[in-house]
UniProtKB/Swiss-Prot annotation:
Keyword field contains Cell inner membrane: no
Family the UniProt entry places it in: Belongs to the small GTPase superfamily. Arf family.
Protein name as catalogued: ADP-ribosylation factor 1
Pfam (any one): Arf
Provenance organism: Xenopus laevis
Record keywords, A-Z: ER-Golgi transport, Golgi apparatus, GTP-binding, Hydrolase, Lipoprotein, Membrane, Myristate, Nucleotide-binding, Protein transport, Transport
Length: 181
């Protein structure tokens, strides 16, 4: 009984929690984004084999962010992280025009999974600081985001190294969580 009141109190006044899965092709900037959000600084990264997981506190929400490696050989493992995921962050290297179709295929494959049917989608169009980077509208088109029905999605132009756009993305996620019944 006491536990019920504690949960009610936490629900009304305490932190909300959101489980986030962050994926994307290798070298898109996922790990850099994770640690920029967690530590506020740029860290030296190596390709992620497996995953990194961190809790990021922002606006009274505790985001548990799973950063899963994006190399093609380990992408089949992404599905093991789908369960209970409320938000999906898909990171795209906006400068990598050659692999944007590959990114689209991976994104659409994931969104077809039953375990992710209720997850909201945030796309980070990363590396906007590079001179040849596609803007958010172009990434939206290339990923086919307008074709998504029955799913809340948002695209945010970002630069992981400066932090530009990252918190705007978290704002959108936190608003989505607040609007869930």
């Amino acid at each position: 009984m006491g536990n019920m009141f504690a949960n009610l109190f936490k629900g009304l006044f305490g932190k909300k929690e959101m489980r986030i899965l962050m994926v994307g092709l290798d070298a898109a900037g996922k790990t850099t984004i994770l640690y920029k959000l967690k530590l506020g600084e740029i860290v030296t990264t190596i390709p992620t084999i497996g995953f990194n997981v961190e809790t990021v506190e922002y606006k009274n929400i505790s985001f548990t962010v799973w950063d899963v490696g994006g190399q093609d050989k380990i992408r089949p493992l992404w599905r093991h992280y789908f369960q209970n995921t409320q938000g999906l962050i898909f990171v795209v290297d906006s400068n990598d025009r050659e692999r944007v179709n590959e990114a689209r295929e991976e994104l659409m494959r994931m969104l077809a999974e039953d375990e992710l049917r209720d997850a909201v989608l945030l796309v980070f169009a990363n590396k906007q600081d590079l001179p040849n980077a596609m803007n958010a509208a172009e990434i939206t088109d290339k990923l086919g985001l307008h074709s998504l029905r029955h799913r809340n999605w948002y695209i945010q132009a970002t630069c992981a190294t400066s932090g530009d756009g990252l918190y705007e993305g978290l704002d959108w996620l936190s608003n989505q969580l607040r609007n869930q019944k």
